[in-house]
Structure formats: structure tokens, C-alpha cells
Swiss-Prot record:
Name assigned to this protein: Recombination protein RecR
Keyword DNA damage carried by entry: yes
CDD domains, A to Z: TOPRIM_recR
SUPFAM superfamilies the record matches: Recombination protein RecR
Pfam families: RecR_C, RecR_HhH, Toprim_4
GO molecular function ontology, one term from the record: zinc ion binding
Its job: May play a role in DNA repair. It seems to be involved in an RecBC-independent recombinational process of DNA repair. It may act with RecF and RecO.
InterPro entries reported for this sequence: DNA_Rcmb_RecR (IPR000093), Rcmb_RecR (IPR023627), Rcmb_RecR_Znf (IPR015967), TOPRIM_dom (IPR006171), TOPRIM_RecR (IPR034137)
Family, per entry: Belongs to the RecR family.
GO biological process, one term: DNA repair
Length: 201
């Protein structure tokens, strides 16, 4: 058994940091050590910011984004085209699309994808609220922007089935060759999808 080299407070900090996606035990130890070395400049302000976030962060009742206000900043933006809704798996996807800045549409966060093997069914996701949003009217297009995985495609098909008969255009993101990508480095599935989704030039 390894000897303890620090007190329980720092051990707890390391254990909590190790739960952050992308940080394993070693990275968490390095991060914790860096934080405690920079106690005044970094650890204190970080603890304060985290406490503030803990008190103020909410889930948007309209789209599922995280913000300090409800409805969120995105839903409250009157310049957005509310008739176009981009459906994403999680908040990180929403933020990524916003960084791209390609569309000024509304969003809907599902909170994951259907995965019967993991016990995740339609009732575990934010699908009913999406169907209700479309049923209210005023939605012209739904862009399904989920990952190109089996679970993502299953979720896309399920949503399409739920919206059958409603006056809404349903599209999905194009799949294929990334900008700057070289064909030799792409997998067969990506190449096949790119060929099927080819467009005229």
C-alpha cells in the first residue's frame, strides 16, 4: 500500500479532479499540485468561481442548455431564427456549433442518445419536450446534429418517427470528409458516407 504524502484535504481535491473528463489520477495530482502552489492567484479564485457557478447555474427549461438564467442566453436572443431548431446530444455539442458560428438558430439538447444496451430509453432523454416544441407550431426545420454513431443514428430515426405527420422539414448534418482531411487517413465508413452524401460543384 502506498504511503500517504499529503493531508486529506488535498487528497480529496485530487480525487474530485480525477472525476473530471480528460483527467486521470496522474493528471489530477499534477493539477492539484499546481493549484495549491498558486493558492492566491489560482486556487482561491477558482474555488470562488466554482461556488458561484454551483449557486447560479440552471438548466434552460426551453432547450436544455446550461446558463445562469432561464430561459438561457441562446433562447432569449431575439435575433435567432426560432423556426429552425438544431438538435444536439449534449451541451458541449451546442457550444461547439455556436463557436462555429455557421447558423443563428435555436437549439434542443437531448441529454444523450438512445442506448438499449446501457438502459437508456426515450423517457431518459429530452425527446418528449422536443416533440411538444414542434407540435406547438412555428418550427420550419429541425436539424438533427447528433454523432454519427449507431446510437446517434438510432436516436435520429426515433425522433423522425415521433414527428411523422407534422409539418416540419427534418434534416441532418452532412457526414464525410473533413475540411483539410486526406482521404488516405479516413476510415471506410467515413469515406462511404462521403460518397453517398456527394454534392454537385
Amino acid at each position: 500500500m502506498a504511503k500517504r504524502v499529503t493531508g486529506p484535504e488535498i487528497e480529496k481535491l485530487i480525487q474530485l479532479l480525477a472525476k473530471v473528463p480528460g483527467l486521470g489520477p496522474r493528471s489530477a495530482r499534477r493539477a492539484a499540485l499546481h493549484l495549491v502552489k498558486k493558492k492566491e492567484q489560482l486556487l482561491g479564485p477558482l474555488a470562488e468561481a466554482m461556488g458561484e457557478a454551483h449557486r447560479k447555474v440552471k438548466i434552460c427549461s426551453c432547450c436544455g442548455n446550461v446558463d445562469t438564467i432561464d430561459p438561457c442566453t441562446v433562447c432569449g436572443d431575439e435575433r435567432r431564427d426560432q423556426a429552425v431548431i438544431i438538435v444536439v446530444e449534449d451541451v458541449a455539442d451546442l457550444w461547439a456549433l455556436e463557436r462555429a458560428g455557421a447558423m443563428n438558430a435555436a437549439y434542443h439538447v437531448l441529454g444523450g442518445t438512445l442506448s438499449p444496451l446501457d438502459g437508456i430509453g426515450p423517457e431518459d432523454l429530452n425527446i418528449r419536450a422536443l416533440v411538444d416544441r414542434v407540435a406547438k407550431g412555428g418550427v420550419r426545420e429541425l436539424i438533427i446534429a447528433v454523432n454519427a454513431t449507431v446510437e446517434g443514428q438510432t436516436t435520429a430515426h426515433y425522433i423522425t418517427d415521433q414527428l411523422e405527420g407534422m409539418e416540419v422539414r427534418i434534416t441532418r448534418l452532412a457526414h464525410g470528409v473533413p475540411v483539410g482531411g486526406e482521404l488516405d487517413y479516413l476510415d471506410e465508413g467515413t469515406l462511404a458516407a462521403a460518397l453517398r452524401a456527394r454534392t454537385a460543384i
